[in-house]
């Protein structure tokens, strides 16, 4: 696929996404080799498309590509953590949480991610509340 064809397809995909036509956006996304794309923001958007369609593992795989392109992005690390929870991979979510805290020690989203991990683990309500009160 050349650059022109890639640009046309991504514009169509983004138009469908804007109209909340997630299935059509996913069909276009399926036709693109995302390993060749260097734009982490575009990869993040494609991951969201797969997430909207309930394909969490595919979305996570695309996010890993984005993380390779932008390893210092706290947004990508946070989304990796939430997607890991959606596929019930608590260990990976915990790793993402630890990485997120290193990248953004003052970001309040770390407490939300910690709470989500505790809730998925079935921790006591007291522990969950404590995580949010921090």
Q: Whereabouts are the PLM-identified features?
A:
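Alpha-helical segment of the N-proximal tetratricopeptide repeat
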Residues: 5-35, 45-52
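Start-of-helix register in tetratricopeptide repeats
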Residues: 7, 41, 75, 109-112
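Register position in tetratricopeptide repeats
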Residues: 18-19, 52, 86-87, 120-121
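TPR-repeat structural position
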Residues: 22, 56, 90, 124-125
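Conserved structural position within tetratricopeptide repeats
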Residues: 31-34, 64-68, 101-102, 134
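Canonical tetratricopeptide repeat
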Residues: 45, 79, 113-116
């Amino acid at each position: 696929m050349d650059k022109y064809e890639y640009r046309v397809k991504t514009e169509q995909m983004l138009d469908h996404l804007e109209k909340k036509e997630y299935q059509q956006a996913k069909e276009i996304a399926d036709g693109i080799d995302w390993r060749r794309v260097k734009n982490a923001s575009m990869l993040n958007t494609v991951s969201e498309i797969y997430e909207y369609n309930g394909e969490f593992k595919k979305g996570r795989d695309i996010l890993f590509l984005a993380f390779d392109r932008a390893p210092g992005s706290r947004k990508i690390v946070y989304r990796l953590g939430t997607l890991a929870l959606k596929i019930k991979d608590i260990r990976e979510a915990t790793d993402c949480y630890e990485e997120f805290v290193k990248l953004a020690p003052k970001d309040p989203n770390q407490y939300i991610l910690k709470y989500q991990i505790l809730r998925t683990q079935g921790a006591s309500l007291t522990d969950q509340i404590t995580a949010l009160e921090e």
